[in-house]
């Protein structure tokens, strides 16, 4: 007579370990100054990844694609064609 010794092992790891449970902090991206709002030179207008909104007159662009005011004035958002947006600063001069 043949005896078979069959052992079954766990397919999944047991309790006490979690493979989830991590998340990155939000990056606070988006428009920081509204259309028509007065800004000072150096104020951040838009934080973005890539150029969803392009810089216009009196607007600079940082190495992380952040748009900021180069001069004091009012913020003006405009559309360029169907799919392009631009932000500019209109000065009082």
UniProtKB/Swiss-Prot annotation:
Keywords (A to Z) from UniProt: Ribonucleoprotein, Ribosomal protein
Record-annotated disulphide pairs: none
Any GO BP annotation: translation
Pfam family, one: Ribosomal_L27
GO molecular function: structural constituent of ribosome
Residue ranges the record assigns to the propeptide: 1-9
CC terms in the record's Gene Ontology section: cytosolic large ribosomal subunit
Protein modification: The N-terminus is cleaved by ribosomal processing cysteine protease Prp.
Family of the protein in this entry: Belongs to the bacterial ribosomal protein bL27 family.
HAMAP family reported for this sequence: Ribosomal_bL27
Protein name per its UniProtKB record: Large ribosomal subunit protein bL27
């Amino acid at each position: 007579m043949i005896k078979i010794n069959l052992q079954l092992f766990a397919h999944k790891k047991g309790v006490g370990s979690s493979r989830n449970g991590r998340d990155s902090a939000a990056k606070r991206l988006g428009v920081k100054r509204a259309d028509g709002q007065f800004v000072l030179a150096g104020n951040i207008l838009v934080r973005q990844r890539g150029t969803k909104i392009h810089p216009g007159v009196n607007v600079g662009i940082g190495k992380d694609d952040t748009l900021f005011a180069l001069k004091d004035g009012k913020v003006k958002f405009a559309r360029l064609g169907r799919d392009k947006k631009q932000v500019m600063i209109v000065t009082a001069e």
